[in-house]
């Protein structure tokens, strides 16, 4: 059965209580990949995937998910600052729909506004050269996106347990 592509909170209802999540920062040339621990506390980088074809990209992402026994995916959705969705967001949604046809793992969409800007500032602060930043920025953006989603899910879990 194909997976669902949903906003993060709705997708979380489809995920088991435990299990790693795979975070993705989708670019036109690369895909940054991060993964969480099974308790969903910490995101760590996995790789920056050089995009080839959708079939090849999806096969690699599904292999990573399988290797990590992932419970689902978190895909950064590039929403404009005014809240609208432009061509990049539409392309991301299309990628998510196509990936969902190949897996039963629910895909959660998470607002990634300013993630690359924040990561670039952090890497500049670490005095990393432009060439080195270019090699790691997408993977670090995937970490940033996934960690933001994990933090939001943790707040929701604490809130629901308190009620």
UniProtKB/Swiss-Prot annotation:
Protein family according to the UniProt entry: Belongs to the YqgF nuclease family.
Subcellular localization(s) per the UniProt record: Cytoplasm
Lineage of source species: Bacteria, Pseudomonadati, Pseudomonadota, Alphaproteobacteria, Hyphomicrobiales
Keywords: Cytoplasm, Hydrolase, Nuclease, Ribosome biogenesis
Alphabetical list of SUPFAM superfamilies matching this protein: Ribonuclease H-like
Function: Could be a nuclease involved in processing of the 5'-end of pre-16S rRNA.
PANTHER family, sorted: POLYNUCLEOTIDYL TRANSFERASE, RIBONUCLEASE H-LIKE SUPERFAMILY PROTEIN
InterPro entries documented for this protein: RNaseH-like_sf, YqgF, YqgF/RNaseH-like_dom, YqgF/RNaseH-like_dom_sf
GO molecular function, one term: nuclease activity
Single GO biological process annotation from the record: rRNA 5'-end processing
Name of the protein in question: Putative pre-16S rRNA nuclease
The protein's enzyme class: hydrolase
Cellular component terms (Gene Ontology): cytosol
EC number(s) per entry: 3.1.-.-
């Amino acid at each position: 059965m194909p997976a669902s592509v949903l906003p993060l909170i709705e997708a979380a209802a489809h995920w088991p209580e435990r299990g790693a999540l795979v975070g993705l920062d989708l670019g036109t040339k690369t895909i940054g990949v991060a993964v969480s621990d099974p308790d969903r506390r910490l995101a760590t980088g996995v790789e920056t995937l050089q995009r080839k074809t959708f079939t090849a990209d999806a096969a690699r992402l599904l292999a990573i998910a399988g290797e990590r026994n992932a419970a689902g995916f978190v895909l950064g959705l590039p929403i404009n600052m005014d809240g609208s969705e432009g061509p990049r967001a539409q392309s991301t949604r299309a990628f998510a729909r196509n990936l969902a046809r190949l897996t039963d793992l629910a895909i959660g969409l998470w607002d990634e506004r300013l993630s690359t800007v924040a990561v670039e500032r952090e890497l500049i602060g670490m005095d990393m050269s432009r060439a080195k930043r270019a090699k790691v920025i997408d993977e670090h953006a995937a970490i940033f996106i996934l960690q933001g989603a994990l933090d939001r899910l943790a707040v929701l879990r604490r809130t629901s347990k308190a009620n």
